[in-house]
Amino acid sequence: MRWSLCLVATFFLGSVHAGDWGTVVLQPEVEKLEEVEVPLLHREVPEHELSGGGLTMEPEAGPYQWLSDDGRIRLRVGVGEDKFEEAVLTIWNWDNIPIYQKRIRGGTEGQFPVEIEGFGSYLVTLDGMSEGEVQRRMIRNITVTPDMNAARETWKLDEFFLGICTFPGRYHWTPGGEATLPKGLTEEEARNLEADLMARLGFQVVRTDESLEMGRRESDENEFLFNFDRMDAAVEAYTSRGFEIGLQLMNAADWAVAEKHNHVEEHRWRYPHEEKAQRAYIKALLERYGESARFVQIFNEPDQVEFWSGTPDEFVTQFEFSKEQIREDFPEVPIANGGYAFVDDEKTAFFIERLHPHVDYSAYHAHGTLEGMIENFEKMKAQHNAVGVSPAKWVNTETGFDAWRLDQERRQAQAVAQKVLYCWAHDHAGIMLFCGRMTRGPGRDGRDLGLVDYQFCSRFAYGAVAGLVSVLQGASFESVLVEEEGVFAYEFVVGEERVVSAFSLSDEGALSFESDASQVMVCDPMGNVVRQVAGGDVDLSLDGYPQYLVFRNAGSVALSE
């Protein structure tokens, strides 16, 4: 565990010409700028997506190198005078607080060196201005995180796994077949960049493009020919980096739809498929990827018609023969249902009752806030109780937060870390965050749940996951200290240390702890040590980000009365 002590820095507004740019030092604890001459992050500003055309901001180390190992980042920044009179470069910390700002005159281009002390993700906006008004905003992140690849070796997978959903094939292409941003990047290049960034966070399990190519019928005798080229590439990108697979089994190709539904012309993949073809497809997938599977998940969100348009009974039939096929070759691998979406409570209850005998993990999905996830989890428990069953383990196989507006990236980071901690504390086998990189609605103009953006910038959520993993690698969950009135605190054990993570849904509140520890280290959401306390008693002011208290040589930790 690397600890970084924090200092306080203050930055001032200035106007610069080419060659006048000194190094800017960013530290975890800073003072807010008194005046900000650009719109705040909740204001909608037309986005300038790509460098050029009047605004340029690129890392000198090379395209997409927004994350630094040593904290040093040099940006090439330029403002075209034919497009803008000037631009304002602003740096915002992960609390959406502006901490640095410079004016840059039109016709200026130069190197902008930054040193980041400690860990963290910072937002950089470059606002092109004319006649005193912002016309376009370029948005990027610069980030330093610890390399947590080694966490896959120390993480206690049998207690709780931390996973990520990534779709380098699906999200590299638009529905019309054109590559999404960034321009000129091949699917292979994009896939490897994303895989490197996800591996660096220490994730152990991935759900990726296993069902990207559905195969085709080879002859009238129902022989099947499957093309795994793109799936092999997607899976190998992660297994070669030490990941296990959350192997999701979707339907085979459209030609294999059951005869009863042959009249359907659109979205045939949503309907029941011929048993022979579906079994052949499942067998082929398992032969190829089964040895790497952490668990196998049969289908996705069957309780909503946009994924399953057959009857509930037809789904149960297909689920049962799918399980039989899995068990022929992999009798021990855990099986999960496709995560429930709670779109139709009656369907969800039906599936829980009928599928319970066939699953090892009872799976559900929950995007949005922690409160929304808790609501879905309570529904899961209530519906299981209503039919008198209890799963061996819960699992959340898809959960994210839509950063629908630029200021919401802070909420995204908070919610992602909160949900990991909550699931860990509530008897889940694991959690699958959604998602690595999502390029629908490139940039911040549309719906986006990615930990990294379309330019491979690591968002605040990326830094928050890195902070969580850096502090809790090798941990075992110990106890819930408090879950009431929007305040949460969880206790973990890591070797000789006890670690408490605490947060508040209201962005306010405080907790006091007492222990027999020799020392307490207070860590911020990004994993920086911001305070050290002699002895075992400590007070903590709360906000929406989980913070971490590391109690050295502690036998016990409790809330103070």
Regions found by a protein language model. Name each.
Residues L201-P357:
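Substrate-binding cleft and catalytic face of glycoside hydrolase catalytic domains
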Residues P357, Y361, A366-R440, C457, ...:
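Catalytic-core region of carbohydrate-active enzymes that cleave or remodel glycosidic bonds
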Residues G176-M198, Q278-E287, D344-R354, R411-V420:
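Short, acidic/polar
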Residues Y64, L89-T90, V482-S518, D524-M526, ...:
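Carbohydrate-binding surface patches
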Residues A425, T439-R440, R447-E497:
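Glycan-recognition and catalytic regions of carbohydrate-active enzymes
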Residues S4-S15:
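Bacterial N-terminal signal peptides
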Residues A18-L197, L201, T208, E561:
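Mature N-terminal, pre-catalytic/accessory segment of carbohydrate-active enzymes
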Residues V533-E561:
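C-terminal beta-strand-rich structural cap/linker in extracellular carbohydrate-active enzymes
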